[in-house]
Amino acid sequence: MIRHGEKVLVDIAFSIRSSLALVGMSGSGKSLTLKAMLNMLPSTMHKMMDVTSDFELIRGENVALIPQNPFTSLNPMSRIKHQFFVQQEEAESLMEMVGLEREMLERFPAELSGGQLQRVVIAIALSHKPRLLMLDEPTTALDSRTKENILSLLKEIREKLGFYMLFVSHDIASVESLCEEIVVLKDGKVVEAGALNEVIENPKESYTKALIESNFKNREWRK
């Protein structure tokens, strides 16, 4: 068990075999789970963990995180070079991979749209050459069209580079095309898990069913 204020995680265990969606409604424990995996919780909380049996803590150069709230300082090129000490040519290549034109490389974040800024964040994550890419609600603040573009970009890049993926979201519709497996959280507990398509088509728990219905309401493309 891991406790953080009023929030508690209980007996959470899962494997990331390829691409996994970690979903649940607000307050379900998604972000707390992610922080626990990344060893980002306050040091006082480590005493509440049974050594590392609750989570195999993920550290080091194998992991990159795309946070919910992107950075606000340094222009794109400087940010990539500053954070991971990559060469100019590599930084330009990364920006090209995420679909940003060269003229945008020297702009500051305040001059970029939400979609452009998220592409920069993706480039920064890729500069780390991760084996596992973790995403924390990366499309929450984007409009529907930009959101679809970012999700398509992530799918294309993952198919090209072949990294593992953990996608944290409250929106199952966002992860449907990206992830093969799903873990559903409620009040810090796993209530359902399995192949994503199977869970969407045949949810066993009423909580999962309600989450799916709220996500796919009025979506004509889901039949």
Regions found by a protein language model. Name each.
Residues 108-112, 116:
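Conserved ABC ATPase signature
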Residues 175-177:
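A short, surface-exposed alpha-helical micro-motif characterized by mixed small hydrophobic
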